[in-house]
Amino acid sequence: MEIRRDKYLDLLIHSCGNGLIKVITGMRRCGKSYLLFTLFKNYLIKQGVKEDHIIGVNLENRLNKSLRDPDALLQYIDSRLSSDGQYYVMLDEVQMVSEFEDVLNSFLSISNVDVFVTGSNAKFLSKDVITEFRGRGDEIHVRPLTFREVADFRDDYSQDMIREYMLYGGLPQVVLENDVNKKVSYLEQQMEHTYLRDIKERYEVRQDSDWSELVDIMASCVGGLTNPPKIADTFKSVKHSSISVDTIRLYLEYMEDAFVLERVTRYDIKGRKYIDSPFKYYFEDLGLRNARLGFRQVEPTHMMENMLYNELRAIGMKVDVGQVFTEVKIEDGSRQRKTLEIDFVCNRGYERVYIQSAYAMETEEKRDQELASLRKLRDGFRRIVIVNGLQPTYMNEEGVYIINLMDFLRAPEKYMEERL
């Protein structure tokens, strides 16, 4: 039984013949190669494309080390273009080729060649798609499996499945593995020996202790507001380290460029402006985050918030942290400015939805706390609170949708539409 990745497969299918280089980005081991070399290749063959017209090269494979030379790669592919008809060139981990931008641009002038490449590092790909391909690159960003993709594969939409997903995440190899000990071992090995080592080697990180401590700090503060100066203060007071703010900023960028972390900016909703700092950071895969901390600190409130962030990004939403400023009366009768937070301000085109993540709303005080910021909004956009447990989905008397977590995970797009 295969894991379906229909959204990404459809994007690849619709991109065929558009005259652009299709650049499939995403963290390592998230399923890019499977998408391109199995799902998409099988689709092409079913459409009648001959196998000798599909030229695939895995550049991570040591057997293809010689093809990491740009001239050798060009010569190899050119030798395979032996007849008329449409050819499909698929290059896996293309950033391993020196001057790969020039190689890819060389194919743009060949009308019967459609090029698809994968890469695992944003510095080498996402930013270069814009600068190097001069508007002729089409990026498709692949994320780890969503909850729905995992639940569909397992045929299991249960509370236990939610808990398992929040613990082990959505890397395909983890989902395919049934043995818990092997899941844990795989995640720990990948986090340490694939993601973090890859970053250290690529950017020549020398301060091993500070680097390791920073990764731990970021794993511990998921969903919390922070910034490089605050982290530097933590190093100084707790770790007795003098690591600079600039070094911390660089290290965070390295993790973002490897698609391990995503940074989320605060947005002043009433003032309609972005607030520079602090930020929130979320992990693209919760299993990697939990593995880094030895599967300790698995606090469900923050795990649910991180999971929802990933689900929203997977359906194409741009996500900010919302800020609403209000005044409250204090004991001496004076008024004091207070900042209220909205977990997710979700934008896609002209659509906007405000979302609060609430693991539980068991008391009136907790309910008021979750609704307080949403009550201050009067712009007509949808307001949602997503709640874990058996809470039924309904709209309250204030026009706020209270949505059960499982209902949302089954069909997130449905709840982001203009009308339910």
Locations of regions flagged by a protein language model:
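Pre-Walker A adenine-sensing motif
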Residues: I3-G17
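Short glycine-rich substrate-engagement loop in P-loop NTPases that contacts/grips substrate
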Residues: G56-G85
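Interdomain hinge/linker elements that couple catalytic modules in large macromolecular machines
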Residues: E2, R148-F325, R337
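A cross-kingdom feature that marks ATP-driven nucleic-acid transaction machinery
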Residues: E2, Y34, I45, V49, ...
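Structural recognition of the conserved hydrophobic beta-strand(s) that form the central parallel beta-sheet
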Residues: D114-S120, H141
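Conserved glycine(s) of the Walker
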Residues: G31
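Hydrophobic anchor at the beta1->P-loop junction of P-loop NTPases
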Residues: I24
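Short regulatory helix/loop adjacent to the ATP-binding pocket of P-loop NTPases
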Residues: K123-D138, R154-D155
